[in-house]
Amino acid sequence: MARIRVLDADTVSRIAAGEVVERPAAVVKELVENALDAGARVVHIDIAAGGLERITVTDDGCGMEPGDAELALQRHATSKITAAEDLEAVRTLGFRGEALPSIAAVSRLTLRTRPAASSAGTVLETEGGLVLSAGVSGGPPGTVVTVRDLFFNTPARKKFVRSAAHEGAMISEMVGRLALSRPEVAFRLTVNGRQVLATSGSGDLLDAIGAVFGAAVAREMVPVRFEERGLGVSGYVGRPGVSRSSRRHQVFFVNGRYIRSAYLGAAAEESLHGAMPAGRHAVLVLHLSVEPGMVDVNVHPAKHEVRFSQPRDVYVVVHRAVREALHREIQIPVEECGHLESACFPGAGTGFRIPVQVTFQGGEPELREESTGYQGFPQLQPLGFLPPAYILAGGADGLYILDQHAAHERVLFEQYLRTLEQSAGKQLLVPVMVEIRGREAQTLEDYGPFLRQAGFEVDPFGEGAYLIRTVPSFLRPGAEAVLLTDVLDRLAGERPVDADAFRRVVAAVLACHRAVRGGDKPAGPEAAALLTDLGRCAEPYLCPHGRPTLIRIGFPELARRFQRE
């Protein structure tokens, strides 16, 4: 009996949908890119229940004739290419003819469309990829696609979708990136009936950055414009004062297409070495223009990644573009942090300094002698410092090498965690205003109860603006906005499930801000104190992010290496 069979069309469609439609944000991306390819100048995205219940994308693009509308729901039907040679120079966002039929295969989809030259439009209703009805429809020129009950017929896929709040935040982030790709298009995103993002469509990228990341960030952006080797780089890079704790605010486009690129990110990060505070990452929005034949956009099912024919040239051009732009505007800061109590983050050129020291009411919380420590931690004696970041220590069983930043992070993390568990927040005499938009705004809404338990009270104050009224009792004045935005940035990636996990995120962010940095040489007493405090920690061998704080080279291993056995 034959074991190999040709799959039926329904199964093939669901497999294809699994590659293209990973989550609701992928649906939004594909539908919006179709709208942009259709020449839309206004795009409205409206979602309910994180996109699982409903996604509606409305555009004022060219619309489709009845025959084209029906073909658009068939696999591999596209207006973007006509032959294999066209793949060598793709100039549109979509080109495979997979998105719409893949979405239809795992949802209940309604397509309404009308070309401007036609007095009537077309409406198609589908379920699980099957066309249920086709008819005539009115409405303005353009296209409206409504997707309901996403993954209703693929329960295995639905199990891996996160909460509605999380999926909504992912959509908000994706729409923000799409808006940054086309500042000449007016975008509007509505989530559960509430507008969370709107861009003007003025064509000014800085306006779009202000709408997506906030006006405070836009004011601190430096223009980037550079051409070399047939490549062009344009966009903006943020000054150190608006740096972030993660790379999530670094956005790259190639010929107008949003991509994920560790390669471009590495080029930009390397160019900023010495300009950004240690452990911080610049806000970046960069558009790279290349000849279509120099980039392959057909290497990823969701087109998130591309391949360059001359990757080294791309790296060099991005590196130079960012470095020259920032160096024209600011002077590279020199850190002069001499000991554990002075870890600093200079905010050069902005009049803004990230406040990393924390003042506690009633004094700094200490790891007291009676606190529960790790019972097996060895007694260590500091021997010296190995640049850039390592303390050498001797123990009864060998040589220990301590990563001073990771160790200091662990000590501070446990201090802050106990304080968060034991103390309430303190009310600020003057509330601090902070701009929070997009995914971070959704995260703020989702974690409101946990924030209050950790000592934060944050209230809305107009579109994209919030007032911080209460903060953890130990926080130094001036650090409120930076801490909150970094906490929200971390939460967007980690999504803690309870108040304890939330407090750990807050404590980890604080510890990372405060901990001594590489290159800071500790004095002898400071090194000894750090070793003692680390030994009193409940988990001394790992920093809050899971990296080792120290390693041991035993005496037998040393003897073997020196051939003394």
From Swiss-Prot:
Keyword DNA damage annotated = yes
Instruction: Give the top-rank taxon of the lineage listed in the UniProt record for this protein.
Output: Bacteria
UniProt xrefs under InterPro entries: DNA_mismatch_repair_CS, DNA_mismatch_repair_MutL, DNA_mismatch_S5_2-like, HATPase_C_sf, MutL/Mlh/PMS, MutL/Mlh/Pms-like, MutL_C, MutL_C_dimsub
Which Gene Ontology terms cover its molecular function? ATP binding; ATP hydrolysis activity; ATP-dependent DNA damage sensor activity; mismatched DNA binding
Record-stated family: Belongs to the DNA mismatch repair MutL/HexB family.
The record's section on PANTHER family has: DNA MISMATCH REPAIR PROTEIN MLH, PMS, MUTL, DNA MISMATCH REPAIR PROTEIN MLH1
Q: Can you name this protein?
A: DNA mismatch repair protein MutL
Please give the organism.
Desulforudis audaxviator (strain MP104C)
Task: Provide the gene name from the record.
Answer: mutL
